[in-house]
Amino acid sequence: MKKENSKTITWIILVLIGFMLLKSCNTKEITEEEPKKSKDTFTIISSTSTSALDDEIKKYGKEHKINIEIEHYGDLEIVDILNNNSKDYDAVWISNSIWLYMLENQNIITDSKSIVIDPVVMAVEKSKAQELGFINKEIKNKEILEAIKNGKLKYVMSSVTQTNTGATAYLNFLNSLAGNPEVLTSEMLKKDTLQKDLKEFFKGVERVSGDEDYLTEMYLKGNYNAMINYESSLIELNKKLVKENKEPLYLIYPTDGVAINDMPFAYINNDSKNTDKKEKFDKIQNYLRSDEITKLLEQKGYRSWFGGIKKDTDSNTFNKEWGIDTTKYLKDMKYPSKTVITEAINLYIEMLRKPTHVVFCLDVSGSMYGEGLKELKEAMTYILDYETASKDNLQFSDKDKITIITFSSNVEDIYPTKLGSETKEVIKQINELETVGATNIYDPSIEALKILENESNDYTKTVILMTDGSSNNGSFKDLKKYYENTSKTLPIYSITFGSSSERQLNEIADLTNGKIFDGKQGLKKAFKEVRSYN
């Protein structure tokens, strides 16, 4: 008996030691994954549009013994982050000063100075621009609108509600069609003629991207002939098009107003007593405004001058054959107040934007049982519920259509909605879902394409596919055959989750000029991101 007790005690001790070692390992892993920032670290929250200078900034920091960290986000996302917690950052580099004015606590932002200038313009394939009479001619925004109204011009752009280029292009067009008033007011937004013109403008949208970088990638892979983007991005795109022996774009600078981004670098004054941080900021800002960086940025297609005339520019970058004339003055638009900008964005969502028909294909196979299905239900409720989605400007409007397809080994059920804002019933149906069977991502994708093929071209049409596993039923060949014979331009966006197959989803993305979003770090975040692409 004593011998048995002794064995039992020994076994318990070994288990406890093992548990303690495991706990120690886990603690170490957590520490390594989430290191605390040193107080000496100078952290910059920066627009994704500035990432081309990361290496130069960090190199400067190393040479001057400043430990610089840079975190990149979309411009409108930066506003949300700083509104919720600015204390994690020491400086902000954003595309346009208007977003600094949208902050709830503007007092923490000081010493803001423009680094470079980057207009947002429409660019059209040169042959199409020639056909429209846009070459070597002074063009007004109204003439662009007329080309769209007459069905002669369609274009792709970034999200108005989630990106800087989309928002500023919209505000510029709105301001111009309102007659370029000294101050754009709330009353002006209510004018029927203005709203009618803006609806016509957005009817020309062929596809929307949730970020500017993907917009360029999407254009290169797709069959489009016009785009709204940064001048610098369009210059880089044209260089790629020429390299691929494709037709470059012709940039159009309306004489009645262009959205100009001043790309300010500003200090975040979290602690006025911390003079060390301020000194580091001053050094970095002065470096960004130095002749060395100015020259480098000009080579990348950014302007270092605001309007006016500059003759000594690189003709390979600021190419006159692409419609770029650096000797002409650019008329900047007058941005309205914070209140009017907010009202204008809401007007766009509810009244102006081209309606969308989104088909969600949701995996309810057996591997989604438990936490996976629970997270899916929460994410879909967030996206579909008007009140919660509107907090992030992601809500569907009455004009939109939503279709839900659930699948496992086959297509399980299809839940359509007629009004995008009336989703209570479909949310209820989603929350009653149960898991069953294996995984087949191809058949529901084909079914989604069939639904959208029958939809009017008055809608932007998108498929969003969410899966947590490898497809062991259905065939990519069947999907490819159907797509190439019918759809051709409809994108399928995929959200990965669990052990989903990157290879299979990449095949679908390549076929449909789509994109893959990572849902493994949270489905809600992934659905929020993909929502901005439609």
Predicted region positions:
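Ligand-binding pocket segment of bilobal, Venus flytrap-like solute-binding proteins
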Residues: 181-253
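VWA/integrin I-like adhesion module and closely mimicked acidic/polar interface patches used
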Residues: 375, 432-435, 467-518, 528-530
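Acidic, polar low-complexity linker/tail segments
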Residues: 8, 26-30, 305-359, 366-374
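Periplasmic-binding protein-like
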Residues: 285-309
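Von Willebrand factor
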Residues: 351-416, 418-466, 494-504, 525-526
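A bilobed periplasmic-binding-protein/Venus flytrap-type ligand-binding module shared by bacterial periplasmic
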Residues: 121-128, 261-279, 296-300
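N-terminal segment of the mature folded domain
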Residues: 33-159
